């Protein structure tokens, strides 16, 4: 099924690819409070991460009609998703980041783009019967202060299958 999708839509990039994913899976998104996101200029969107890759794809698809200058700070493994890699700044989560990566991160925080971050760093988990993020890392706050970027918190409502939470 994935191969069929990629054969049909593999030529799409960035938000167009995300729109196709949303259509394929028949997913609709409701945005509330979009007016709190500036229409231009630098802003950080700090989001919970309940759905893994799908929340990022859904958010790109929905937000792209409002702003086109979207970048995500992601696990560098996701740079292998060539249809989306132009939207990503990859971070090595399991080792040191090279000087070139630190430079890219600094450039992203210095730019005027919408910079999307999942501060927990991982998909939400089930704790004592409740689905929630791991503790948010504070690094993005330090960057936001130093670069004078506004931070807008974003709540994404959703959860994965019970099977996922039994695994983790």
State the predicted function of each range.
Residues 109-122:
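A structural motif
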Residues 43-96:
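Catalytic core of membrane glycerolipid acyltransferases/transacylases, capturing the structured
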């Amino acid at each position: 099924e994935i191969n069929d999708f990629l054969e049909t839509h593999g030529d799409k990039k960035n938000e167009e690819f995300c729109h196709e994913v949303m259509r394929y899976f028949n997913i609709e998104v409701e945005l509330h409070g979009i007016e709190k996101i500036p229409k231009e200029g630098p802003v950080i969107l700090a989001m919970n991460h309940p759905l893994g890759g799908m929340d990022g794809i859904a958010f790109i698809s929905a937000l792209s009609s409002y702003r086109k200058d979207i970048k995500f700070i992601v696990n560098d493994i996701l740079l292998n998703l060539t249809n989306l890699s132009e939207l990503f700044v990859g971070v090595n989560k399991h080792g040191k980041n090279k000087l070139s990566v630190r430079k890219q991160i600094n450039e992203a925080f210095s730019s005027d783009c919408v910079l999307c971050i999942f501060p927990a760093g991982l998909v939400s988990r089930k704790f004592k019967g409740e689905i929630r993020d791991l503790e948010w890392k504070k690094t993005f706050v330090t960057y936001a202060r130093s670069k004078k970027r506004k931070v807008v918190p974003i709540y994404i409502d959703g959860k994965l299958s019970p099977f996922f939470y039994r695994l983790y």
